[in-house]
Amino acid sequence: MCVEGDEHMFRIAICDDERQFRKRIHDILIEYMNENDILYEIDEFESGKDFISLGINLAKYDIVFLDVNMDELDGMETAQKIRKVSNDVFIVFVTAFITCAPQGRIQRRSYKIYSEK
């Protein structure tokens, strides 16, 4: 989805292997952006592998919401690969499984936000 204009447009990626959680994050973001008249573009990815396949183009995103627990390439591994391309992408980790959350790993790597789904 894209809302265009002359001002800065926030480019947001949602990377989660569960469709219902991608939709929930997407809906929350749309509501917030529209209420605050913020221009945005939101893209969704089913896996870390799909997102990383963008290569250098993943640096176009301002914010990436990453599920911590995904098959093939989990959120932490995906974040490491993002950092190899760009230090400017703001990463938000999300998870539905708080008991499995790698909070220490997130803090040690100086990522800023961690949120339960």
Outline where the language-model segments fall:
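CheY-like receiver
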Residues: 61-117
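Switch/coupling loops of ABC transporter nucleotide-binding domains
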Residues: 10, 40, 89
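Two-component/phosphorelay signaling modules centered on CheY-like receiver
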Residues: 19-43
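Acidic, metal-coordinating helix/loop segments flanking the phosphotransfer/catalytic sites
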Residues: 26, 44-63
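Conserved acidic carboxylate
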Residues: 16
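Alpha-helical elements of the RecA-like P-loop NTPase motor core of helicases
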Residues: 23, 53, 102-103
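Hydrophobic "anchor" residues on beta-strands that sit immediately upstream
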Residues: 12-13, 63
